[in-house]
Regions:
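Repeated scaffold domains used in trafficking and secretory/extracellular systems
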Residues: 53-59, 92-100, 139-146, 181-188, ...
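Residue-level detector of Asp-centered blade-edge/turn motifs that repeat once per structural unit
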Residues: 20, 60-63, 101-103, 148-151, ...
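Conserved beta-propeller blade signature
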Residues: 23-25, 65-67, 107-108, 154-155, ...
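Short loop/turn segments immediately following the C-termini of beta-strands
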Residues: 28, 71, 111-112, 159, ...
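Short loop/turn segments that connect beta-strands within beta-propeller blades
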Residues: 38-40, 78-82, 121-124, 168-171, ...
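An edge-strand/N-cap motif at the start of beta-rich repeat modules
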Residues: 19-45
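Conserved small/polar residues in nucleotide/adenosyl-binding loops
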Residues: 242-244
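Surface loop/turn motifs at the tips and blade-to-blade linkers of beta-strand repeat domains
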Residues: 46-51, 87-91, 131-139, 176-180, ...
């Protein structure tokens, strides 16, 4: 089984070493969520997934707890593996995305007919819900990672339709752009344009936020010494650098 690695750089760790030296990783096909030393690759901590769980999103909260999706739900756990809350989804749906909101809450993306986008507060209580018909019958083909933009809207890459949607917290479609590729994730750049990792298309692209025009494309062999295989997630680092997984 191919392993799709989704990486979040840890922002605050308290009892551990310098944040920039650690990586929190997980991915479809990987039975564990891992904390790695960035330089040596040594596993410093791991959290085992239960049988049948699939993790396509993981993040560290401001409080230092671990948030992750597991296909049939999302969990918030502590470093000693205690479950803070466990949000389960109904049958015939998939919870593929669990990401952090600007206010410290959580945004859940649930694939289904219709798809659901749910905000939870820091205690795991539902505070906002948007339902949207993505016109994709098979839940697994809908999306993977959903993020909140700086203007509080949601950015939804719809894989099966090869398009991205910007949707308000009230469920209004603000923008819709067709793209060449099945975007797995997204990154809002400092200039507000959108960087889209395109999974099995072995590339990432940058599109104009307002028009959808493709401004840049980096293909599998365009970076010297590196071959882009499944391009799952890209993070913004300092000094205009990016981290590709």
């Amino acid at each position: 089984m191919r392993v799709y690695i989704i990486i979040w750089i840890i922002l605050s760790m308290g009892f551990r070493a310098a944040a920039q030296d650690k990586l929190l990783v997980a991915g479809s096909g990987n039975p564990n969520i891992l904390l790695l030393d960035k330089q040596t690759g040594k596993v410093e901590w791991q959290h085992a997934l239960e049988k049948g769980e699939e993790c396509n999103a993981v993040a560290l909260t401001r409080k230092g707890e671990i948030l992750y999706s597991y296909k049939r739900g999302a969990k918030l756990v502590t470093w000693d593996h205690q479950v803070v809350w466990d949000y389960k989804t109904p049958d015939k749906t998939e919870l593929q995305s669990a990401t952090l909101l600007q206010n410290g809450g959580v945004l859940l993306g649930i694939c289904g007919v219709p798809a659901q986008f749910i905000e939870l507060d820091k205690k795991g209580k539902e505070v906002n819900k948007v339902t949207l018909n993505l016109e994709v019958e098979r839940p697994h083909s809908q999306f993977r990672q959903i993020f909140q933009l700086r203007n509080s809207n949601y950015l939804i890459p719809v894989m099966a339709k090869q398009k991205v949607l910007e949707v308000s917290r009230k469920g209004k479609i603000i923008a819709e752009h067709q793209i060449e590729g099945k975007a797995f994730s997204s990154l809002e750049l400092p200039d507000e344009n959108l960087l889209l990792p395109c999974g099995d298309n072995h590339c990432y692209i940058v599109i104009d936020r307002k028009t959808g025009e493709e401004l840049k494309r980096v293909n599998a062999l365009d970076i010297e010494g590196v071959a882009l295989l499944f391009v799952g997630q890209i993070l913004q680092l300092k000094l205009s650098l990016i981290h590709i997984s």
